[in-house]
Amino acid sequence: GATLRITRLRPSGRGADVWDELHPTAAQQVQLYDWLVARGDGILTGDSFFHLSGLGQPGALAGLNLCGAGRVVCLIDPVGDVYACPFAIHDRFLAGNILADSGFQNVWQNSKLFRELREPQSAGACGSCDHYDGCRGGCMAAKFFTGLPLDGPDPECVQGYGEPALALERDKPKPSGDHSRSGGRKGPIPLKLLKLPPKKFCNESPV
């Protein structure tokens, strides 16, 4: 049968404008956790919901139990910039550029940022929490874009440590620039249209 992949709403990109209004309540987090555990491997979550692992037994929730940024995942944007995470598009998490830095392999293996992310991380403010081994402090991008310290609790910490941190005065980072780099070509971009009939109808038709 089919599987479903769901992704956590993070306060980055366009999500930054709606996160305060739309992110799940504590009760909804529990409901989501129970739903994910009940469906097991039929739901693909990647590392999106490891911050919920403190609600149950270790290993009950499918997927990684740590932030995969720079370890198992990264993002390459249309101009070749490599970021540690698809949800962390900011100069703070820019590892390099595949065009300027001798290709992706060099960036992935030798970037200073990626090497730092792969080192053992300090538990910081979460060091005294019994559930730290389960969630590893939560999502790096969620913390950064809500103005919380990277060694602090996830803003949606299921043990309740995120809410007091969010109540403090915070400096939310702004986008570090226009990553579209649209200042080059002016005018329309010519497209190459297919003049020969497609080999299969489904190659052209969305239905």
Describe the role of every protein-language-model region:
Residues 1-82, 87-96:
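Radical SAM enzyme [4Fe-4S]-AdoMet core and its adjacent flexible, acidic
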Residues 87-207:
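Flexible mid-to-C-terminal extensions adjoining Fe-S/redox cofactors in radical SAM and related proteins
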